[in-house]
A protein has these predicted regions:
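Metal-coordinating catalytic core of metallo-dependent amide/deamination hydrolases
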Residues: 123-155
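Histidine-rich, glycine-flanked metal-binding segment
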Residues: 2-3, 11-57
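General beta-strand structural signal in soluble alpha/beta enzymes
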Residues: 48-49, 105-106, 134
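Glycine-rich, flexible loop/turn motifs
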Residues: 44, 73-74, 128
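Metal-associated gating/positioning segment near the N- to mid-region
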Residues: 53-120, 142
């Protein structure tokens, strides 16, 4: 298993303690050790100098819509094809992981099972993204934002 040593980072550990200088040893995709003050003596395949950089635990998005990309009006949710929505959801997953979110709770998506499909691809390692607790299609009352009936559909 690959080992990465991150040296000289300012570490925020989310315990309530003040940030501190130190080293992090990562094995695979898990933090194996945190050494306050630095000086980790463990061997590593890769060493990263994080001087002047900040390390913290991944964040969790508690109300996420992977496929709601640049949505400024209901039309932006309804008019894209299912194929376009798949790519939007994949980009949404990538944007979250790139921003430091390692988990997302899906509130709903523009198409049925969209977050489930993206979650499955992320879990299989074929798509970059956070851990996804997938939600389904948005449920809405008549006339509200999620209503796709003929009378309210802008298509």
């Amino acid at each position: 298993m690959a080992r990465t040593l991150i040296r000289n980072a300012t570490i925020f550990d989310a315990t309530g303690a003040a940030p501190f200088a130190g080293d992090l040893l990562v094995e695979g995709n898990r933090i194996a050790a945190v050494v306050k003050g630095g000086g980790c003596a463990e061997p590593a395949d890769t060493v990263i100098d994080a001087s002047g950089l900040f390390c913290m635990p991944g964040m969790t998005e508690g109300h996420g819509h992977l496929s709601f990309e640049n949505v400024t009006a209901t039309e932006n949710l309804i008019t894209p094809t299912p194929e376009e929505q798949v790519f939007a959801a994949a980009r949404g997953a990538r944007a979250l992981i790139d921003a430091g979110f390692t988990s997302v709770y899906g509130a709903s998506e523009a198409k049925l099972r969209l977050a489930v499909a993206v979650r499955n691809e992320v879990n299989a390692g074929r798509l970059p993204g956070p851990r996804i607790r997938a939600g389904g299609l948005e449920i809405s009352v008549t006339g509200a934002m999620g209503d796709e009936s003929t009378g309210h559909n802008p298509r």
